[in-house]
Amino acid sequence: MERVIVQFSIPGMTSKVYDQIWDELRKAGQSHPAGLHYHVGAQQGDNWLVVDVWESVEAFNKFGETLMPILVNAGVNPESSKPVITPVHYEYDAALVH
């Protein structure tokens, strides 16, 4: 399997909506999504930026089956918020350095 970076830039999203989405993901049993190695979310201008590292595109797509309906219910337009998926070339994890 090839690790991938998944990036979302979601127009108009706020931290409040982002937190609500995570609450819904937890209710759906996705507190720790299978295959997700790393996740960050932050306000970037008028957009909400999400950057993930996933074990594989297949793992992300499986999670997307739960995520996408939650995003739509939160008012996110899937057409303007499509993820950019890029294969990982190199990954450094400081937690693994002793």
Give the positions of each predicted feature:
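Short S/T/G/P-rich N-terminal loop/turn motif that feeds into the first structured element of a domain
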Residues: 1-51, 55-69, 76-98
